[in-house]
Amino acid sequence: MEAMKMRLFVAVLVAAMAFSAVQQAAAVEAPAPSPTSDASLAIPAFFASVATLAFGFLF
């Protein structure tokens, strides 16, 4: 059971890193979001959610 949790945690981390890399590559050519857009908050919110889920699974 512990090994399965660790595999899931590693898989989520790899997916998050891949998602971040793809979004950074796309952001190079994209225009900046408008000041009223909350698009810049999507990545920190995603990492906070993943960290919370990982903490719940591990502890």
Swiss-Prot record:
Contains 4-hydroxyproline; hydroxylated on Pro-31, Pro-33 and Pro-35. Proteoglycan that seems to be implicated in diverse developmental roles such as differentiation, cell-cell recognition, embryogenesis and programmed cell death. Belongs to the AG-peptide AGP family. It is found in: Cell membrane. The keyword NAD does not apply. It comes from the Eukaryota. One of its GO terms (cellular component) is side of membrane. It is a lipid-anchor; GPI-anchor. Its main location: membrane. Glycans are attached at residues 31, 33, 35. Keywords: Cell membrane, Glycoprotein, GPI-anchor, Hydroxylation, Lipoprotein, Membrane, Proteoglycan, Signal. The keyword Transmembrane does not apply. Coiled coil: none annotated. Residues 1-27 form the signal peptide. This is Arabinogalactan protein 13. The gene is AGP13. A lipid is attached at residue 37 (GPI-anchor amidated serine). The modification 4-hydroxyproline is found at residues 31, 33, 35. InterPro entries: AGP3/12/13/14/21 (IPR039281). Residues 38-59 form a propeptide.
